[in-house]
Amino acid sequence: MLVAMEGSVGYGIGGARVELEIGYERFKTKGIRDSGSKEDEADTVYLLAKELAYDVVTGQTDNLAAALAKTSGKDIVQFAKAVEISHSDIGKKVCKTKPNSGTNNYGKYAPETDTTAEKSDVAICGGKGGTSEGGSSEEVFKQFIEKTLKDGSQNWPTSKDKGPGARSEVKSKQNDNAKAVAKDLVDLNRDEKTIVAGLLAKTIEGGEVVEIRAVSSTSLRT
């Protein structure tokens, strides 16, 4: 099976070389004769575009954040569960809470942010704990879903804060959770982003894997 998210895939059929230019929304087929003197370009063939998957593998944080913000919280929960089941190591790199100082008082995921003197509750992905009552270790994507998003009906794409009593620096901002998740996904390494893109396509965008069979020779350029 040959899978390409972006770039160019070339393969030979008989005496001709066929090159697929693969990008967002479509690809074009090009036939090159043996002599290499002439190139014929066929009509454009459209693929079903997968916005979330594309934005992840190409590292477009702002576009990914905007696309995630339009995605339902319930779909995000399903995506997170898929990550936890198949690649929990990746989930440990997403929405990692931060300590208030040094290695103490990590943020603890909750339905709303409250980091007053007695609490370190956070509803923002990767939130920082308060000055006391914080966790002894970081919490990650799994806990963010379980304690903050729950069934997806709250805290997505924007987190909820406790209100006037909470510290001003942890006030919720529009689409803050969508932006934080997008940043963490884009910060993953190349292989991890490819895995995440596949899970996004499968769990949210209804993606399908396209197989190219009986390839006699291949070259991949990205």
Residue ranges: model-predicted function:
Residues 1-222:
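Long non-transmembrane domains of secretory-pathway and surface proteins
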